[in-house]
């Protein structure tokens, strides 16, 4: 029997994780709930439909976590990382949007909070044999692998974790599908059995994103320009509200639909192109920074990558790795590979590592407006 601390979020996945560890594997289980966002302290007003509710979603999750702990007869503790989350994850998110990039906060939330500050707190206060979460992934010998349920696999979001962070982590849901997890919860009358999965920004939740950003970044209006003709075809309130390839641009009176082809942040220009024009979204090579190498013994001939979550794997070749910078090529080409997002590399089921997409190229030329 081992002493295991479970990150209990108040959702069905972490609830079943705790149930499996205690009642199927007979471990000593301690639950810890993290509170990482405070809508009032963080000025989360615009775009927040929950702001006037009697109980905010974070407190509702805490109530559900306490109910699960009571059902399972395990102790539960609460820890507050609101300041740490704001300083180490949220300020990065806002600055990336301010720079016209499209960040992935969930990956840094995992690196710095769920598997950073949380592990530090748990080690100091409980000294467990292992730490468990309800993520869909596998860890073997401090290496990261995909989960059995490819549709729910979260190794993409865990790609910035170090081997040191992974060494005491276990994922009890690694070989289970979501249907099986909900069945286990229902058969054992767990109060979270039918609870909706959390979506939106890590620990913040669903928001009207344009309004949400206005809480933190002032509008920066500028021209919408046809990238082929250089003609001004409209106005925007800020390039941060648009992402590469986006088609919802609200241009009226146009003969054909347009998509976002890029931007010039300095001159506040949003470039668009007609769907009948040349494809301005393609790339066949990228540079990524802050690359985190998890598996050093990978097979160079068997590599694939994802440029966004749930994307089908695409074959790639590593051209160069220099400290924490990597260059890769993908001869089959790909559309809308977006700076600020993460590229995550796989060798079969093994997650080799991941980094932040910094630049993209097409046929030897830099995509200067991506």
UniProtKB/Swiss-Prot annotation:
SUPFAM superfamilies: Adenine nucleotide alpha hydrolases-like. The active site is at residues 109, 202. The keyword Membrane does not apply. InterPro entries: MnmA-like, MnmA-like_C, MnmA-like_central, MnmA-like_central_sf, Rossmann-like_a/b/a_fold. It catalyses: S-sulfanyl-L-cysteinyl-[protein] + uridine(34) in tRNA + AH2 + ATP = 2-thiouridine(34) in tRNA + L-cysteinyl-[protein] + A + AMP + diphosphate + H(+). GO terms for cellular component: cytoplasm. It comes from the Bacteria. ATP binds at residues 7-14, 34, 134. It holds the Pfam family tRNA_Me_trans. The keyword Signal does not apply. Disulfide bonds join 109-202. Residues 152-154, 308-309 are annotated as: Interaction with tRNA. Transmembrane segments: none annotated. One of its GO terms (biological process) is tRNA wobble position uridine thiolation. GO terms for molecular function: ATP binding; tRNA binding; tRNA-uridine 2-sulfurtransferase activity. The record marks 135, 341 as: Interaction with tRNA. CDD domains: MnmA_TRMU-like. It is found in: Cytoplasm. It is an enzyme of class 2 (transferase). Catalyzes the 2-thiolation of uridine at the wobble position (U34) of tRNA, leading to the formation of s(2)U34. NCBIfam families: PRK00143.1, trmU. Belongs to the MnmA/TRMU family. HAMAP family: tRNA_thiouridyl_MnmA. This is tRNA-specific 2-thiouridylase MnmA.
């Amino acid at each position: 029997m081992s002493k295991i601390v479970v990150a209990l979020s108040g959702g069905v996945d972490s609830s079943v994780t705790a149930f499996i560890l205690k009642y199927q594997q007979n471990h000593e289980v301690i639950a810890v709930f993290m509170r990482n966002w405070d809508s009032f302290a963080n000025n989360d007003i615009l775009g927040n439909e929950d702001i006037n509710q009697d109980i905010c979603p974070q407190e509702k999750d805490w109530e559900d976590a306490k109910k699960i702990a009571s059902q399972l007869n395990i102790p539960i503790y609460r820890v507050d990382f609101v300041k740490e989350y704001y300083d180490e994850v949220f300020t990065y998110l806002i600055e990336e949007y301010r720079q016209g990039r499209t960040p992935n906060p969930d990956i840094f939330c995992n690196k710095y909070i769920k598997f950073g500050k949380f592990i530090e707190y748990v080690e100091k206060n409980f000294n467990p044999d292992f730490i468990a979460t309800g993520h869909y992934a596998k860890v073997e010998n401090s290496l990261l692998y995909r989960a059995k349920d490819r549709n729910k696999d979260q190794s993409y979001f865990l790609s910035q974790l170090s081997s040191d962070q992974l060494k005491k982590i276990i994922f009890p849901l690694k070989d289970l599908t979501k249907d099986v997890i909900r069945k286990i919860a229902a058969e054992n009358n767990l109060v979270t059995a039918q609870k909706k999965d959390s979506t939106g920004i890590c620990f913040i939740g669903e928001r009207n994103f344009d309004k949400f950003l206005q809480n933190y970044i002032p509008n920066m209006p500028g021209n919408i320009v046809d990238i082929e003709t250089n003609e001004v075809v409209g106005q925007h309130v800020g390039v941060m509200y648009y992402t590469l390839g986006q088609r919802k641009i609200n241009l009226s009176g146009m003969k054909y639909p347009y998509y976002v082809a890029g931007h010039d942040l300095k001159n506040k220009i949003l470039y668009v192109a007609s769907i009948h024009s040349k494809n301005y979204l393609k790339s066949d090579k990228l540079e990524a920074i802050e690359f985190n190498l998890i598996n050093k013994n990978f097979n160079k001939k068997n590599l694939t990558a994802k440029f966004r979550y749930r994307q089908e794997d695409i074959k790639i070749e590593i051209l160069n790795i220099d400290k924490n910078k990597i260059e890769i090529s993908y001869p089959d080409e790909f559309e809308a590979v977006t700076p600020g997002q993460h590229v995550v590399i796989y060798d079969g089921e093994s997650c080799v590592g991941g980094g932040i997409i910094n630049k993209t190229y097409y046929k030897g030329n830099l995509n200067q407006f991506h």
